[in-house]
Amino acid sequence: MGDKRVVLNKDIFFQRAERLYELWETGQVGLDSVNSIAVAYGDSENPYTKSSALHSWLFGHEINDTALLFLKDHIYILGSNRKVEFFGTVTGVQYNGRVPPVSTLLRDKSDKDAGNFEKLIDYIKRAEGDLGSFVKEKFNSDFVNAWNDALKADDINKTDVSLAFMHLFAVKDDKELELVRKSAQVTTTSWTAARQRYVEIIDSERRVRHSVLSSEFSAYMKDPKIQQSLAKYNADTCYDPIVMSGGNYSFKWNHDNSEAHLHNQFGSIITSFGARLSDYCTNLTRTMLIFPSAELEAAYEAILAAEFAVIAALKPGVKLKDVYKIGVDTLTEKNPKLAETLNKKELGFATGIEFRESRLSINAKCEEVVKEGMVFIVYIGVDSIPNKNKGEKGKPAAIAISDTILVKAEGDNEVLTEKAKSRLKSNVIKFKEEQENRETERDTDQKKLLGRGQRSVVLNDQTRNKTTNEDLRKERQKELGKQLNLNAKARLSKQDGGTDEKKVKKSNVSYKNEERFPQDTDVQKMLIFVDRKYDSVIVPIFGIPVPFHISMIKNCSQSVEGDFTYLRINFATPGSQVGKDNAQFPHPLAHFMKELTFRASNIKEHHSDATPPSSNLSTAFRQIKEMQKRFRTEEAEEREKDGAVKQDKLILSQNKLNPKLKDLLIRPNIIQKRITGSLEAHTNGFRYTSLRGDRIDVLYNNIKHAFFQPCDNEMIILLHFHLKNPVMWGKKKYKDVQFYTEVGEITTDLGKYHHMQDRDDMHSEQQERELRRRLNTTFNSFCEKVSRLTNDQFEFDSPFAGLGFFGVPFRSATTLKPTASCLVNLTEWPPFIVTLSEVELVHFERVSLQLKNFDMVFIFKDYKMKTQMVAQIPMSSIDKIKEWLHTCDIWYSEGIQSLNWAKVMKTITDDPEDFFENGGWTFLDAESEGEDAGDDSDESDAYDPEEADASDGGSSSASDEDESEGEETESDDDEEGSLDSDESEGKDWSDLEEEAAKADKRREVEDGGRDRDRDRDRKRPSSSKAGPSHKRRK
């Protein structure tokens, strides 16, 4: 089991065990005579066995030296002490009445488990019938060999149940498909790096052996720089990556990579590899064509068409032999000669925990039927393809294409490795050679301008097809736009069509009955009385004491004029409060009193009176103010509690090895003093405990997003939890909580003297680097332990620093970084978090060539939510953001103007049917279509350095040019047009940019010379010293 502490996922175990017993009850696929199934597992040279697959499928891990016995009424597990503890969560539990209870037996090594084997064999004999097992599997384990010897000694009749478990493993559940998709992502990411590696090798003409490249590609699976967030899964390879070129090709999966050098001049390079993530396999095979002939390109297209036909034919209910026939027929139709050298053994096979399931092979004899949820590796390989180019008799080439696909009942099957493009133009490498014969003088000038040409690699989709990729992105955006309107219309139609209910102001009754009405002397004397107990003010109106709740009093004021004191009370009435928190009154059509004014004398009426009559007004004024302040504070606390939830009780784990981080600070300042504490993971949540003893609990089921941001290029390292529902801590509710540690010095003494070779500074920098490395390792280890503790149900997401861009989400400029599911800024406070799954669309505002910045607006699927804006994003980031949104399948639009989104969203929510009948969100795309037309016209007037130089030369020396020079310029223009057409076919963007840069630099030099001439003219002596001008000289 390894050194890492693992936990058995109880739910997955019982759900999959239930599937096993359901299949067993049917008595199909060889289980009709089986009354018990025994599986003993140990070390084996073969990594793909049914025994190991059963362990991974049920337990999530391979557990050596254990024996499993499945009976109709019981499950027995034999293992060591530590392994028995692993199964503790499922022992003695009967799940759903279908899975029998589980019991564990502790191994006894003193008698080499003879007693335990005797018990298990006794259970098998009582069950009667045959014993199901994987008969053909062999292990290098004394434990497994002893178990097999014990079965032989008792003459137990065995039946091979491999076919039954093949059917059981073939159809994947949702958890399995999630792992398969991640495995495919690792595979395609590794291919992207491998493809770039081929380009570097061929461009530099390096000699690299096939075996060396195989080792490099294998390392790509675990390289954090390549896999980024997927590196934490520690994916392995399904087999040693296969690299073939130079005529030595084989379609066997156990092919040994030769020590020969990669043939990088012409022909084909075949690469096959696959990732194995959490024991689930995926695979892809790609063929790079180097300087191919037209025949070789046609062969590639035919083989690709055959692969597409096989993928389309893999639908539920279809026999695999029929799928095979469709693939062969398609290739024969496209190119009959290729069908003769096709690898006809099979055109693919099912995959999963086992890389290759031979019983589910796409061949001419397989009678098995395709089912929804199966995962297949489709593989089309053709050998001995003639490869003649440029008169050279090249070695025969081979082409192989493979992808991993998921079978779906409706719609097209999902190609899991689709990101590794298999189309021809993405896998063709051509050379751009220096043209040696230059016939015209203009060609010589052009050569001087561009510099000496060099041989370089040009991927076919690097030049002309870059525009194609942009077109594909636009096409995809159009599809997303159409789907967006359809989905939004359907979603809003399911919701209630009524308008939003306005918030009704709470109706506060001062006294619910007469018994509670106070009988104070002030009330009897018709004076103003402030009742603190019931938050009411009793005032006399026409000789009757009338109570008003403090919530109905808007404000009050007191003034002294002469011998009288005035108290003015203003009441809250409909329409008197303006703002977003304005609430509707319970009875808005009733009659309301707007204000009351009371007057009292400042002079005592009798000498015996202790106070003048106005003292009642002064006392009432003071008490009303105090009561208003207290009531509004209580109201604010009630509003703060609105929407907050009470979390479940944290279940503390008594395990001393719980994941724990120390010396952490917390944001926001839930704890008054800025003191550190520790964060510990428990059974159902986290607990943060400060040094002072303050405790803050965060439960797993209330965490919407969990982020881990390393301290690379940051001053803090942090863990951030974005909650589903706000939680009350103290008297405030919070939806975000962050635990962090500061790294290095945030402030620097600018007055301190520094020397570049100061040993203290060098030592402190080295210490800071070591601290950063240690903190990253510690935090990353904490996240991995939490994932294992929760059986991968709780994972931390990390921002992608390479995709970050600057923007202003609130008041200050920050770096916004995408994650797998969000766009975040966690360093500044308050944090900025946008969940991408909640985003309907993104609109870019103020997009113009004249502006350096633009704004980005997020519109959410819940149209009642306020839109989120990120302002002041540099224009240089717009292409990167568009590509990121495109990969996330989020529709975006752009425009020059800034929109009033509050009014736009109100218009939509008031009448959504009319909005979508008039085109829906396409009104945002109207400007972009017009801009596209403008872009096309701009592209037709593309910049050309020669044309620019010709125009500059003509304007600067028009008076001195003769007719012959003008004729030469015209001829140059004609030649220039032909050059442009050549450039569109051969030059890539990097060359054109270099060409434009050199032309700009040369023109700057010429302009600088003319500027210096003008400066010298300004500094010449005056005419009194230099004599009269030429015009005045006679």
Swiss-Prot record:
Coiled-coil intervals, chain numbering: 617-642
Chain residue ranges for the region called Disordered: 433-511, 926-1034
CDD domains associated with the record: CDC68-like
Pfam families assigned to the protein according to its UniProt record, in alphabetical order: FACT-Spt16_Nlob, Peptidase_M24, PH_SPT16, Rttp106-like_middle, SPT16, SPT16_C
Start-end of Basic residues biased regions: 1021-1034
Highest taxon above the source species: Eukaryota
Biological function: Component of the FACT complex, a general chromatin factor that acts to reorganize nucleosomes. The FACT complex is involved in multiple processes that require DNA as a template such as mRNA elongation, DNA replication and DNA repair. During transcription elongation the FACT complex acts as a histone chaperone that both destabilizes and restores nucleosomal structure.
Protein name: FACT complex subunit spt-16
Protein species of origin: Caenorhabditis briggsae
